[in-house]
């Protein structure tokens, strides 16, 4: 499988290399790259979801598992959503929405409650609550226009996280991530 890599160069010199992985358990596959970067004087920053006990993770557990997989290297680790709680990138997104758009999530939460409390008994079995990725997708879908071009902006690679109509980039919730990145760049 082809590695996802992005390089950020300043004055023609690569300063930042971003290595995409399929998930935290893949990290041992790039351990040689981590060691090589370390030997060349680089700093290794690792950013993953902390996950929750519901998907065999959690902040403390995930951090330890990553340390175990990359033992013998020096890395700085940040786990979404805020480098202290269980959760994922989508939890961070949920906490940085523009507050004027909070009613969209209020509706979503009512939908989840309805599925659990009303629809499940009527269907005769427990229903699956859609993933948090779906919640973020629906949030953006509700805010963006109906044209094909606007709908494209809902998808991961085309999302505009600088759009202050959608996201509050000044919220204190982002401070742990901002501090982590600022400290190491």
For every predicted segment, state its role.
Residues 49-148:
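Activity-critical C-terminal alpha-helical subdomain
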Residues 1-45:
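RecA-like P-loop NTPase motor core
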Residues 15, 45, 89-90, 137, ...:
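Generic secondary-structure boundary/loop-capping signal
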Residues 44-48, 53, 164-165, 179:
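Small/polar/charged residue-enriched interaction surfaces, especially the RNA/DNA-contacting tracks
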